[in-house]
């Protein structure tokens, strides 16, 4: 009898060891033997911290952003009309006195005007024959021409003078970030606008976030929406660039949404320049899992700004039991860091529980059969 009991115990342990691992699937992290920090808000009711809205045509209209209309920019037009370049340190000037070649530095066949012109020294002055040292930094070309004409009038009868900039080296604006050729761009006698600077930099890259461009002028940052400017014709977004301005085009890495739950492939998706709809996000995640997904429970979880009214998130629910409701998904625009979650159908949850219990039930059945066999085992 003792021999049978021993055999039965061994077989029982073997069967239990094979079935025990099926009782609790996946990894586990126990907190029972660890220090758990108690926080003042440990006890909270999550249900009271969210708002849930069914996705309806009315909600789509309510959430839809106001259309961006084409707008003129009279302020920029006035700035361009009044624009005059002011000479700076490092510029190279070309001074021409008609009928007096001895006063005009010849460029020569193999020498550019920038090599032979009058360089503006660190003190902001140039040297010119019959005049000597002449302060030019901060002045316009018209002011310098008038001053040279007046100074030469005592040695030349009715001098005809022309002054131009042979090389613009003193003042620069900077275009950085997601453009084809980032770097500095000279401020010249031709006004430089945001559009001009981006075109000169080779345009935007595929990863550019053109809705959140930042222009820094005199330490003050201004948001520029290139989408509104380029796609919608809102010319108010175009601004005149000044020396030292920085135009930064960020990457769209932060423009992402998360698709979780019963989809073909749980994913982190990056939004492109045109944005992303709920239908696009589901499509990029290989759609709903038709075997286990609950089509009535397609949720978009969106964090609220500054926990308005004590709410941490707004949740939008799309009931797509009727597939034609997915047309609403094509109109629902996602925002960065939205979470798209597709719930599991109740029957699928039950099937999963059963699938976990079947190995255990089989093990118990095997154990019962083994017990009967042992009881009939000859001594």
UniProtKB/Swiss-Prot annotation:
Highest taxon above the source species: Bacteria
Stretches that traverse the bilayer: none
Coiled coil: none
GO biological process: monoatomic ion transport
GO molecular function per UniProt: polysaccharide transmembrane transporter activity; porin activity
Principal subcellular localisation of the protein: membrane
Keywords from the named record: Cell outer membrane, Ion transport, Lipoprotein, Membrane, Palmitate, Polysaccharide transport, Porin, Signal, Sugar transport, Transmembrane, Transmembrane beta strand, Transport
Lipid attachment locations (N-palmitoyl cysteine): 21
Topology class, membrane: Multi-pass membrane protein
InterPro entries: Poly_export, Poly_export_N, SLBB_dom, Wza_C
Endpoints of the signal sequence: 1-20
Gene3D superfamilies documented for this protein: 1.20.5.70, Outer membrane lipoprotein wza domain like, wza like domain
Compartments in which it is found: Cell outer membrane
Gene Ontology CC terms: cell outer membrane; pore complex
Residues with lipidation of kind S-diacylglycerol cysteine: 21
Stated family: Belongs to the BexD/CtrA/VexA family.
Summary of the function given for this chain in its UniProt record: May be involved in polysaccharide transport.
PANTHER family membership: POLYSACCHARIDE EXPORT PROTEIN GFCE-RELATED
Protein name: Putative polysaccharide export protein GfcE
């Amino acid at each position: 009898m003792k021999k049978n009991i021993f055999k039965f115990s061994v077989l029982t342990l073997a069967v239990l060891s094979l079935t025990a691992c099926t009782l609790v699937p996946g990894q586990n992290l126990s907190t029972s033997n660890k220090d758990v920090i108690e926080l003042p808000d440990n006890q909270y009711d999550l249900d009271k911290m969210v708002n849930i809205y069914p996705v309806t045509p009315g909600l789509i209209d309510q959430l839809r952003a106001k259309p961006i209309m084409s707008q003129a920019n009279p302020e920029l037009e006035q700035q361009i009309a009044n624009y005059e370049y002011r000479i700076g340190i490092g510029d190279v000037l070309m001074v021409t006195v008609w009928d007096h070649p001895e006063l005009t530095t010849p460029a020569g066949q193999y020498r550019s005007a920038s090599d032979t012109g009058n360089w503006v020294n660190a003190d902001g002055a140039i040297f010119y024959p019959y005049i000597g040292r002449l302060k030019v930094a901060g002045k316009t070309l018209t002011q310098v021409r008038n001053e040279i004409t007046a100074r030469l009038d005592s040695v030349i009868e009715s001098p005809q003078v022309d002054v131009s900039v042979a090389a613009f080296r003193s003042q620069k604006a900077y275009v950085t970030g997601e453009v084809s050729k980032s770097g500095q761009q000279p401020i010249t006698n031709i006004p430089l606008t945001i559009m001009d600077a981006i075109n000169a930099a080779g345009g935007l890259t595929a990863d550019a976030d053109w809705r959140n461009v930042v222009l820094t002028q005199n330490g003050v940052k201004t948001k520029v929406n290139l989408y509104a400017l380029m796609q919608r014709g809102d010319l108010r977004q175009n601004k005149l660039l000044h020396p030292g301005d920085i135009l930064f085009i960020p990457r769209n890495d932060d423009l992402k949404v998360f698709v979780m739950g019963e989809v073909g492939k749980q994913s982190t998706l990056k939004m492109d320049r045109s944005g992303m709809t709920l239908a696009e996000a589901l499509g990029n995640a290989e759609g709903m899992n038709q075997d286990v997904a609950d089509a009535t429970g397609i949720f978009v979880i969106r964090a609220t700004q500054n926990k308005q009214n004590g709410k941490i998130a707004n949740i939008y629910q799309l009931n797509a039991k009727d597939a034609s409701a997915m047309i609403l998904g094509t109109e629902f625009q996602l925002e960065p860091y939205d979470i798209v979650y597709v719930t599991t159908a109740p029957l699928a949850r039950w099937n999963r529980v059963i699938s976990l219990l079947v190995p255990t039930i089989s093990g118990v059945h095997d154990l019962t059969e083994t017990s009967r066999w042992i009881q009939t085992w000859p001594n």
